[in-house]
């Protein structure tokens, strides 16, 4: 789980007292973040089975009803994780676009960023490749499909300018083929990472792999 947004509430030290102090109740926004953080932590356990709201509530030491005060359904919880993935990744994509000129170098940095993001967030990786969504609402998988479609489109746009300058007779087609190949490579690396129990890092031999493709 990343340490940028989904950070659990820090415990507050209290002085010993004759009577036990009441547990501090998190604010609504803090509780939502705590729920998502815990869900992502549970997803990153190798071999984790389908996560139920009962198991999530037990981990948080709250009732299932308490979860539903913050999310209408478990699908909405997964949507919260997907939103975090989308916002994090495409914010970084935009930063790369501002720093790097369009071309193969920019495309390589986008792919590397995506794989490093997944490597640092194993629980999110299971959402990205769909393993965690198998038994959930179909729209969640559709949304992740759209995420990778957008990644592919971004890579195509990045590569198109370089191919135009290189004198390609079919720059649009060539850019599409390369973008599709890079996206398939990235998805394959994420799937291997998840299905190896997070033992095979997606960034393994990354520079050499990208050099062969670009």
Task: Kindly give the residue locations of the regions a language model identified.
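Ser/Thr-centered, proline-biased regulatory motifs
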Residues: 49-55
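Alpha-helical structural segments
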Residues: 30-41, 45, 59, 76-99, ...
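Helix-turn-helix DNA-binding module
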Residues: 57-58, 138
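Short helix-capping/turn signature of helix-turn-helix
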Residues: 71, 130-136
């Amino acid at each position: 789980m990343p340490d940028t947004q989904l950070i659990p509430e820090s415990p507050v030290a209290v002085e010993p007292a004759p009577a036990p102090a009441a547990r501090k109740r998190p604010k609504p926004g803090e509780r939502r973040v705590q729920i998502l953080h815990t869900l992502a932590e549970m997803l990153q356990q190798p071999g984790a089975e389908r996560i139920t709201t009962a198991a999530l509530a037990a981990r948080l030491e709250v009732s299932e009803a308490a979860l539903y005060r913050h999310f209408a359904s478990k699908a909405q919880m997964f949507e919260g994780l997907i939103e975090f993935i989308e916002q994090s990744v495409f914010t970084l994509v935009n930063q790369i676009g501002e720093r790097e000129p369009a071309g193969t170098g920019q495309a390589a940095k986008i792919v590397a960023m995506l794989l490093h993001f997944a490597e640092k967030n194993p629980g999110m990786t299971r959402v990205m490749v769909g393993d965690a969504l198998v038994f959930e609402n179909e729209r969640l998988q559709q949304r992740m499909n759209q995420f990778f479609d957008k990644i592919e489109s971004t890579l195509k746009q990045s590569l198109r300018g370089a191919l135009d300058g290189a004198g390609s007779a079919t720059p649009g087609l060539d850019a599409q083929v390369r973008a599709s190949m890079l996206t398939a490579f990235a998805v394959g690396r994420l799937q291997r990472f998840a299905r190896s129990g997070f033992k095979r890092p997606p960034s393994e031999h990354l520079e050499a792999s990208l050099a062969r493709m670009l």
